[in-house]
């Protein structure tokens, strides 16, 4: 052996030197100081830009109160900010297409969460723990032949 280890201290130093560091997430912003992310839910796809501001949310060039009339959907969109304790600190501009209103609200929430982590990487653990960064992969089950719907059978008559 060319090199021998004399004590346990040297062994622990070698271990820490060889251990790879956890991946460091960097701030990802464009020249306008905006973070961009895409969010998906069911059939809906949202393109989201966030920038520091007064908390104004615009969806498809309309106010969030106009586009998402139901309070539950607006609450869904605000969840990432409230969990990260950043309510009213960022302006959100997003375009969303496909699916229904519930899927679109979920897609916007997913996009906002991802954009927040690009803007402030230290929020990643909080949002990940809340489940905002994972893509909800549940989609509508396909219709099968020989059935009325995905699982419902045609009416059965015994005689």
Curated annotation (Swiss-Prot):
GO molecular function terms listed in the Swiss-Prot or TrEMBL record: RNA binding; structural constituent of ribosome
SUPFAM superfamilies, alphabetized: Ribosomal protein S5 domain 2-like
Taxonomic superkingdom: Bacteria
GO biological process per UniProt: translation
GO cellular component: cytosolic small ribosomal subunit
Keyword terms: Ribonucleoprotein, Ribosomal protein
Leader peptide range in chain numbering: none
One Pfam family hit: Ribosomal_S9
Transmembrane segments: none
Family: Belongs to the universal ribosomal protein uS9 family.
This protein's name: Small ribosomal subunit protein uS9
Source organism (scientific name): Bradyrhizobium diazoefficiens (strain JCM 10833 / BCRC 13528 / IAM 13628 / NBRC 14792 / USDA 110)
